[in-house]
Amino acid sequence: MKVVIQRSKEASVTVDDQIIGNISSGFVVLLGITHEDTYEDIQYLVSKIPNLRVFEDENGKMNLSLKDVGGSILSVSQFTLYGDTRKGRRPNFMQAAKPSVAEDLYNKFNTSLIDEGIHVETGEFGAMMDVKLTNDGPVTLIIDSKDR
């Protein structure tokens, strides 16, 4: 699994001109899922993401986690994170998991975050979405569960 995490002051996701998820302070998490991903990858990311110390403390130092500041997550499925651009000009997405597999893992990822006490808003799996955010910092991190 690959995630792009963006610290945000506010964020929302819209489908068919309707806002279906929004958060104030927290993370926008774009989640890409590949063929080999399992529940073990979910567990790794769920233990890592809410505890990343990327929010400022009273001294302006990045010392606080999402849990520490009571932040939320806007979780958006993003198969294009597995786009391969090595050949030609059109990415191929052969490394992205099939939708039926990816949707199940995406839902388990979100449920696992909720089980950790995190408020999670989501996009709609497989839908064309408009994601808006005010990037805070900006602070943007990329984590691949295979790099542990």
UniProtKB/Swiss-Prot annotation:
Reaction(s) the record says it catalyses: glycyl-tRNA(Ala) + H2O = tRNA(Ala) + glycine + H(+); a D-aminoacyl-tRNA + H2O = a tRNA + a D-alpha-amino acid + H(+)
Which top class of enzyme applies to this chain? Answer: hydrolase
Q: Which UniProt keywords are present, listed alphabetically?
A: Cytoplasm, Hydrolase, RNA-binding, tRNA-binding
| Hydrolase is among the record's keywords | yes
Top-level taxon in the UniProt lineage: Bacteria
State the compartments where it is located: Cytoplasm
Listed GO biological process terms: D-amino acid catabolic process
Question: What InterPro entries does the record tag this protein with?
Answer: Daa-tRNA_deacyls_DTD, DTD-like_sf
EC annotation from Swiss-Prot or TrEMBL = 3.1.1.96
- Give the residue interval(s) assigned to the motif Gly-cisPro motif, important for rejection of L-amino acids: 137-138
Q: Which SUPFAM superfamilies match?
A: DTD-like (SSF69500)
GO MF assignments? D-tyrosyl-tRNA(Tyr) deacylase activity; Gly-tRNA(Ala) deacylase activity; Ser(Gly)-tRNA(Ala) hydrolase activity; tRNA binding
Q: Gene Ontology terms, cellular component aspect?
A: cytoplasm
**CDD domains reported in the protein's UniProt record:** Dtyr_deacylase
Similarity annotation: Belongs to the DTD family.
Q: What is known of its domains?
A: A Gly-cisPro motif from one monomer fits into the active site of the other monomer to allow specific chiral rejection of L-amino acids.
Tell me the NCBIfam families matching this sequence.
Answer: D-aminoacyl-tRNA deacylase
Q: What does this protein do?
A: An aminoacyl-tRNA editing enzyme that deacylates mischarged D-aminoacyl-tRNAs. Also deacylates mischarged glycyl-tRNA(Ala), protecting cells against glycine mischarging by AlaRS. Acts via tRNA-based rather than protein-based catalysis; rejects L-amino acids rather than detecting D-amino acids in the active site. By recycling D-aminoacyl-tRNA to D-amino acids and free tRNA molecules, this enzyme counteracts the toxicity associated with the formation of D-aminoacyl-tRNA entities in vivo and helps enforce protein L-homochirality.
Q: How does it assemble?
A: Homodimer.
The protein here is known as D-aminoacyl-tRNA deacylase
Q: Which gene encodes it?
A: dtd
